[in-house]
């Protein structure tokens, strides 16, 4: 039956929600600026449409638990340590709540809404899994996860979390009241989801799927109980298979829990335990209001006790909530989720055995259980594409649970004016739009800055800061633009504004230190970097590098050497050479070499020749090119890393001339170009044989890198040195230079 006129706004809201569910995974999993802005904007507008008053609608009355949660969230937001991320987190949280409420209301008031939303979810999962498998067959363009199913998420555990929910949505569709075509598609969705879960190689998601299926089976036990011996054997085999998959990881935890000769612990498990310990320390220090919504990554730098062990979240949703919103909020969410699962299972059991809704409700209860378990061991919630599906499934499952989201007419609750809620949603939509435009202005400003258009860059960045006064990126790039415009004092003032907004963010202090260091304000640089090191001594080696370089200018040799010893005791040579450091901070070995050269000069100045030689040897060793891949071992000799590609280019030039060296450039950059002409002119004065002698700096990741290094050669009795800067890109065939190297006379300057 066609919907009546009063239902049309709600129908439109359901269609918008369904479209967002399909589109969000392709917007960088919902993490990109356009993905987050689109999510909040569309869901907020859909929620406003769904709230349009109809004469038969009862007043909106929220139950006590939801009201208490709102109070705790508000208090946490007031006392946040990082306002910008808090605003974004609150916008996303509001979008999830609205999606959940829309799904629940639509499932009750529109006969086809539940069916349409579940079909949308499993169809989206089928499309994502199909394309992901195609990429997997092709090797995912190489990289660390070349042999795992990652899809558009770029991370196998996230892909697993997405397929987990899509698979249960397909299972909920396998009921007798669905048409054959729909059932066939859902059956294919179940099969593809199971295969995809296996191909992610994620043991945690397989465990979550098994527990979710167990809940589904227990709710539907009347169907298999008569044949319980057969099903019991199948369940036992499944349990044994699960233990075999998970056993080696559990055994890897033993050396962490009971130190001894138990072997080397699993790196991933070790990382998670460290993060959880530091997160619990954060909860103990901020038990009432937490550190603020979305502020966990900034707060973690204060508690980090080992380098290269950090992250955006602790891979445990409940600990993250307790850390960000306070312990009471963590307990409230955990308790409410347990209460919901119990009520959902009981509601399904009360339905008649032949009712298709019973099987559907059982599958939805299994989906929520699986998501709840996987959220305790991974980061599903941090991917908006997954969180939105979870919120939608939660809403559909709660539609048959009266009083859960809306208070009963005679129950305890508070009546909310629809006009007020619509106004809140419209404000959220406007905020999402302005924040996205502010992010776009930052991107345009960076482009103008790179092109040398300083007035244009300044205008864009100023506008961005006006639209989002709390944003760090706009102030960061505006400070550098102001510095390049010849106003070091103005640049320092811009950077110090970020400290006033978020004084506990060490990156704000480090930005002021960088600007002051380049601008020659050594005392300001020393103070700023010292504050960054005090706040987050384990977060980044470059905090220590800045402090050492500033102290070398204004402090005594003893102060500088003391700062160096502190840095090298934390970021030891062994640690910066570790594969984990190579993946997370590939340039740290060269930063340590840089400050070791400074320390060697200071040791020479105080007459300690033995220590000078030791430190200089350390610097030489660390500054040698690293031929290992970044985050992965590539099978392309001579192009396994950015440094290897650069060495191959110069070696080919020395041995066989420039035409042979061109094969280490990106194919589209080979041949006569402006870069080729510039390089040909600069290399005429160079000896034929030049070698890479010293790596000064490397910045980038496993796909893109910028390398600053020195090449040297001999011309008669003269030693020729050139400072070179090169951008290198990763392709399936290995690393390639983006363009011909840019040469400067003499040694590189820091």
Per-region residue spans from a language model:
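C-terminal luminal/periplasmic domains and tails of membrane-associated envelope-modifying transferases
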Residues: 442-639, 649, 657-664, 745-750
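Short solvent-exposed beta->alpha transition segments
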Residues: 634-638, 643-644, 648-704
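Flexible juxtamembrane loops connecting transmembrane helices in multi-pass membrane enzymes
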Residues: 148-152, 209-213, 243-278, 284, ...
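Internal/C-terminal transmembrane anchor helices
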Residues: 230-246, 410-437
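Transmembrane signal-anchor/signal-peptide helices with a preference for the extracytoplasmic
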Residues: 103, 373, 427-446
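Exposed beta-sheet edge and beta->alpha loop/turn motif
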Residues: 687-689, 696-750
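TM-adjacent membrane-interface loops and short helices in multi-pass inner/ER membrane proteins
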Residues: 155, 273-314, 318-321, 325-332
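Alpha-helical transmembrane segments of multi-pass inner-membrane proteins
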Residues: 3-27, 37-51, 70-77, 83, ...
């Amino acid at each position: 039956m066609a919907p009546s006129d009063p239902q049309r706004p709600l129908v439109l809201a359901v269609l918008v929600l369904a479209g967002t569910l399909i589109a969000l995974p392709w917007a960088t999993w919902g993490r990109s600026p356009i993905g987050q802005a689109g999510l909040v904007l569309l869901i907020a507008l859909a929620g406003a449409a769904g709230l349009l008053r109809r004469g038969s609608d009862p007043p909106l009355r929220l139950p006590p638990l939801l009201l208490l949660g709102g109070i705790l969230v508000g208090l946490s937001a007031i006392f946040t340590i990082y306002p910008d991320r808090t605003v974004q987190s609150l916008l996303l949280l509001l979008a999830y709540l609205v999606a959940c409420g829309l799904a629940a209301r639509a499932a009750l008031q529109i006969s086809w809404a539940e069916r349409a939303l579940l079909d949308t979810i499993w169809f989206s999962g089928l499309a994502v899994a199909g394309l992901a498998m195609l990429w997997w067959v092709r090797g995912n363009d190489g990289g660390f996860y070349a042999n795992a199913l990652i899809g558009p998420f770029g991370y196998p555990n996230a892909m697993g979390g997405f397929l987990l929910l899509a698979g249960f949505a397909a299972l909920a569709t396998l009921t007798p009241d669905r048409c054959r075509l729909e059932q066939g598609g859902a059956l294919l969705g179940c099969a593809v989801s199971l295969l995809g879960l296996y191909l992610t190689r994620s043991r945690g998601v397989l465990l979550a799927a098994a527990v979710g299926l167990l809940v589904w089976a227990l709710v539907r036990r009347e169907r298999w109980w008569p044949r319980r011996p057969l099903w019991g054997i199948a369940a036992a085999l499944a349990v044994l298979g699960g233990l075999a998959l998970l056993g080696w990881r559990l055994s890897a935890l033993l050396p962490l829990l009971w130190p001894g000769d138990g072997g080397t612990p699993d790196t991933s498990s070790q990382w998670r335990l460290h993060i959880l310990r530091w997160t619990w320390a954060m909860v103990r220090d901020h038990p009432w209001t937490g550190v603020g919504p979305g502020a966990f990554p900034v707060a973690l730098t204060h508690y980090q006790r080992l380098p290269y062990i950090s992250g955006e979240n602790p891979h445990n949703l409940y600990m993250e909530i307790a850390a960000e919103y306070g312990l009471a909020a963590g307990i409230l969410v955990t308790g409410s989720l347990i209460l919901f699962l119990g009520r959902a299972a009981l509601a399904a059991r009360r339905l008649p055995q032949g009712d298709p809704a019973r099987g559907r409700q059982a599958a939805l209860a299994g989906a929520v259980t699986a998501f709840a378990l996987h959220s305790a061991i991974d980061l599903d919630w941090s991917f908006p594409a997954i969180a939105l599906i979870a919120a939608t499934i939660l809403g559909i499952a709660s539609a048959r649970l009266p009083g859960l989201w809306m208070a009963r007419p005679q129950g305890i609750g508070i009546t909310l004016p629809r006009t007020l809620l619509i106004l809140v949603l419209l404000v959220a939509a406007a905020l999402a739009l302005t924040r996205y435009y502010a992010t776009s202005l930052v991107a345009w400003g960076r482009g103008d800055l790179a092109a040398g258009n300083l007035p244009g860059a300044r205008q864009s960045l100023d506008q961005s800061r006006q639209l989002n006064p709390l944003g760090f990126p706009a102030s960061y790039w505006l400070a550098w633009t102001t510095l390049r415009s010849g106003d070091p004092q103005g640049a320092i003032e811009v950077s110090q504004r970020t400290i006033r907004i978020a004084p506990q963010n060490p990156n704000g202090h480090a930005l002021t230190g960088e600007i002051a260091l380049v601008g020659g304000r050594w005392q300001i640089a020393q103070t700023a970097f010292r504050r960054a090191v005090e706040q987050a001594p384990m977060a980044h080696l470059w905090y220590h590098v800045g402090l050492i370089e500033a102290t070398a200018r204004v402090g005594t040799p003893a102060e500088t050497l003391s700062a160096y010893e502190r840095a090298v005791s934390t970021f030891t040579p062994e640690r910066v050479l570790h594969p984990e450091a190579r993946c997370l901070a590939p340039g740290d070995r060269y930063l340590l070499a840089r400050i070791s050269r400074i320390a060697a000069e200071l040791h020479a100045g105080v007459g300690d020749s033995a220590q000078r030689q030791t430190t200089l040897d350390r610097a030489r060793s660390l500054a040698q090119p690293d031929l290992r891949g970044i985050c992965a071992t590539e099978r392309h000799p001579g192009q396994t890393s950015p440094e290897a590609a650069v060495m191959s280019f110069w070696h080919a030039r020395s041995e066989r001339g420039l035409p042979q060296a061109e094969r280490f450039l990106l194919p589209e950059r080979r041949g006569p170009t402006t870069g080729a002409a510039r390089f040909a002119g600069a290399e005429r004065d160079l000896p034929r044989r030049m070698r890479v002698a010293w790596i000064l700096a490397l910045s980038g990741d496993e796909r893109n890198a910028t390398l600053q290094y020195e090449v040297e050669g001999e011309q008669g009795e003269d030693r020729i040195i050139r400072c070179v800067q090169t951008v290198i890109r990763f392709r399936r065939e290995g690393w390639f230079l983006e363009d011909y190297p840019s040469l400067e006379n003499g040694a590189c300057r820091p």
